[in-house]
């Protein structure tokens, strides 16, 4: 019982060829068979089956199926679901249950989606390999000695392994797009504010955005359309009208499309096979009528530095709420209140989270605020201006998703700076808040996935998805 797309699944459901319960049982069996891969932190076995029976009954009784009727979905474990565990893959929240639903979850539920469980991730979404999880790392679906990417590695692996049709992730600096590239699937980070962040556990509030991972652009567009739109629960969510993404994708033509190709995205250090495959796809698009336009983004070298100053500063503030006093893990080895705070955080947070909290506290301190944090904010504004200028001249900016294919488990854990460079091509879109997507290009000579990264102007998700769909269909 395999499905190439949601359209394939839906046609079989509404024609009564199969039932939602049969679909859910199929996916739950696959999840059980992959239990050793740590892809799911929590599986909603009974809840998913009950939900499936409810939807089957609705269809039998003549009810109108929702836009996502029967879609089996996975949810990253930093997105709130009422009365379900919300761990953020951290010891400090290991047994915490959310008391409310994220807006994105509510909208998916209203559209008749089915949730199979919560997926593994880097702790508090801090990481690029899924190795920072308190619940163990997740292997790459195509080589179990390698990483699936992060921080939404569990969501990407779930889709790639056929353990969910579509999954939600969160993207702060590439956490949806980079694992999508490493797992040979589509991963979309929408414009900042396109999807409500209400119910998304905050890492860096001015960067965080819920994203979508799927096998194809049509499924991703459908889920995006359901979740997108203003939410009074999130003041940063946008009132910009939600487009008809399917229509925009259908009318997109590659002929005459201007594709910006920054030389900064193809440094000498870029993996040769990644470079060859991305350039090959660009030449293929040129042959189909697109125009390749050289663009210059001279400040690209500062992207990683500015990003890690800004997000760690925000993280040090956001994670102050996890203190052992109100909820979550509390150390039993404390003599007084001050010691309880220190011990709970020391024992509850993993090494990478503590590293980022300390760095963020440092750059916000009185003696270094102007030198680091203020300068990074200025660099962010320069980036926004540069990308606006570039996208005034071209339709899309293209390059690799990652500078290298999936790397080995443990290869970069002892060198945080080398790990951070995995996001060098995805971070700029997060700094400026523009929509970006990773689309599969196929496999290199070692049978490892390679992804291509596309950036469009604010709220041009329809165009972005249309270009990505054309590329994926021409593979």
Curated annotation (Swiss-Prot):
Residues annotated as the enzyme's active site: 76, 151, 175
Biological processes, Gene Ontology terms: translation
Gene Ontology CC annotations of this record: glutamyl-tRNA(Gln) amidotransferase complex
EC number(s) stated in the UniProt entry for this protein: 6.3.5.7
GO molecular function, a single term: glutaminyl-tRNA synthase (glutamine-hydrolyzing) activity
This protein's UniProt keywords: ATP-binding, Ligase, Nucleotide-binding, Protein biosynthesis
InterPro entries reported in the protein's UniProt record: Amidase (IPR000120), Amidase_CS (IPR020556), Amidase_dom (IPR023631), AS_sf (IPR036928), GatA (IPR004412)
Pfam families in UniProt: Amidase
Entry annotated with the keyword Transit peptide: no
Chemical reaction(s) catalysed: L-glutamyl-tRNA(Gln) + L-glutamine + ATP + H2O = L-glutaminyl-tRNA(Gln) + L-glutamate + ADP + phosphate + H(+)
Record's signal peptide: none
Purpose of the protein: Allows the formation of correctly charged Gln-tRNA(Gln) through the transamidation of misacylated Glu-tRNA(Gln) in organisms which lack glutaminyl-tRNA synthetase. The reaction takes place in the presence of glutamine and ATP through an activated gamma-phospho-Glu-tRNA(Gln).
PANTHER family: GLUTAMYL-TRNA(GLN) AMIDOTRANSFERASE SUBUNIT A, TRANSAMIDASE
Subunit field text: Heterotrimer of A, B and C subunits.
Protein name: Glutamyl-tRNA(Gln) amidotransferase subunit A
Organism of this sequence: Pelodictyon phaeoclathratiforme (strain DSM 5477 / BU-1)
Organism lineage: Bacteria, Pseudomonadati, Chlorobiota, Chlorobiia, Chlorobiales
Gene: gatA
